[in-house]
UniProtKB/Swiss-Prot annotation:
Enzyme class: hydrolase
Keyword Hydrolase part of the UniProt annotation: yes
Official protein name in the record: Lys-63-specific deubiquitinase BRCC36
InterPro entries: BRCC36_C, JAMM/MPN+_dom, JAMM_MPN+_peptidase_M67A, MPN, MPN_BRCC36
Superkingdom as given in the UniProt entry: Eukaryota
Pfam family, one: BRCC36_C
Modified residues (Phosphoserine): S258
UniProt keywords, alphabetically: Acetylation, Cell cycle, Cell division, Chromatin regulator, Chromosomal rearrangement, Cytoplasm, Cytoskeleton, DNA damage, DNA repair, Hydrolase, Metal-binding, Metalloprotease, Mitosis, Nucleus, Phosphoprotein, Protease, Proto-oncogene, Ubl conjugation pathway, Zinc
Lineage, opening ranks: Eukaryota, Metazoa, Chordata, Craniata, Vertebrata
Protein task: Metalloprotease that specifically cleaves 'Lys-63'-linked polyubiquitin chains. Does not have activity toward 'Lys-48'-linked polyubiquitin chains. Component of the BRCA1-A complex, a complex that specifically recognizes 'Lys-63'-linked ubiquitinated histones H2A and H2AX at DNA lesions sites, leading to target the BRCA1-BARD1 heterodimer to sites of DNA damage at double-strand breaks (DSBs). In the BRCA1-A complex, it specifically removes 'Lys-63'-linked ubiquitin on histones H2A and H2AX, antagonizing the RNF8-dependent ubiquitination at double-strand breaks (DSBs).
């Protein structure tokens, strides 16, 4: 028997430039999870016929009649600095949430749109895309403050056993009170596919939550927005700051001998060089290629302008 689930959010529209920043952030660290916050707005689109679940290439009509479809639009993301690196867990401090809210207010003034923190994202390196019971409980806590709050997970560094090629899976979910019985509707999404999935998490009876996947649609953009560009450029700085913080904490210990300190310094230098090779170098090359492309496009527009001006002068 199917369980009727009332969703606070029916779909998520993620801008392609924000998606690019999330993907680069997730692929920047293979051993620990990374995290960030999503900035956007929540729109209520009135529908008189059916509820639509949006996917990357199609639109499916659900037989349930609704009055309004609540869609979360994610325009940009904020990369968070990790104070504690863990392989299987990430945490967002109240100070980071407050700083993100301040940034959202600044963006609202610049764009004239009701920007706010609408969700969070984190990575799952080498593990499944589905949220853990800790992720589901954390998401439920955020939804107590905002029912429209969503969570995104990027599963990376996954190798297909048949083709031996890497894959990146992603999902968007919310938490709801667990039902006595539920059933899975679809499977995970591999890049541009979409699905809806429900499963009960093994928690205490009085605290049980289940995840429900929210259909997500990547909105294509020809250009990258200024805010997302700033976030992409900020990524190497944040990774460097995290390495410096970790090195300073270890270096401040008084019981370390000279050999250990030299070893720690070598590891710190090695990590910085690895980041330059894996993150900073490709990012710089991408920015240079983008600049060259923009300059070429500018020349084409200037040439087109001159041709139009000549045609206009000939008509006069």
């Amino acid at each position: 028997m199917a369980v009727q689930v009332v969703q606070a959010v029916q779909a998520v529209h993620l801008e392609s430039d924000a998606f690019l920043v999330c993907l680069n952030h997730a692929l920047s660290t293979e051993k620990e999870e990374v995290m960030g916050l999503c900035i956007g707005e929540l729109n209520d689109d009135t529908r008189s016929d059916s509820k639509f679940a949006y996917t990357g290439t199609e639109m499916r009509t659900v037989a349930e009649k609704v009055d309004a479809v609540r869609i979360v639009h994610i325009h940009s993301v904020i990369i968070l600095r990790r104070s504690d690196k863990r392989k299987d867990r990430v945490e967002i401090s109240p100070e980071q949430l407050s700083a993100a809210s301040t940034e959202a207010e600044r963006l609202a003034e610049l764009t004239g749109r009701p920007m706010r923190v609408v969700g969070w994202y984190h990575s799952h390196p080498h593990i499944t895309v589905w949220p853990s019971h800790v992720d589901v409980r954390t998401q439920a806590m955020y939804q107590m403050m905002d029912q429209g709050f969503v969570g995104l997970i990027f599963s990376c560094f996954i190798e297909d056993k048949n083709t031996k090629t890497g894959r990146v899976l992603y999902t968007c979910f919310q938490s709801i009170q667990a039902q006595k019985s539920s059933e899975s509707l679809h499977g995970p999404r591999d890049f541009w596919s979409s699905s809806q999935h429900i499963s009960i998490e093994g928690q205490k009876e009085e605290e049980r939550y289940e995840r429900i996947e929210i259909p997500i649609h990547i909105v294509p953009h020809v250009t990258i927005g200024k805010v997302c560009l700033e976030s992409a450029v900020e990524l190497p700085k944040i990774l460097c700051q995290e390495e410096q913080d970790a090195y300073r904490r270890i270096h401040s210990l008084t019981h370390l001998d000279s050999v250990t300190k030299i070893h720690n310094g070598s590891v710190f230098t090695k990590n910085l060089c690895s980041q330059m090779s894996a993150v900073s170098g490709p990012l710089l090359q991408w920015l240079e290629d983008r600049l060259e492309q923009n300059q070429q496009h500018l020349q084409e527009l200037q040439q087109e302008k001159e041709e139009l001006m000549q045609e206009l002068s000939s008509l006069e």
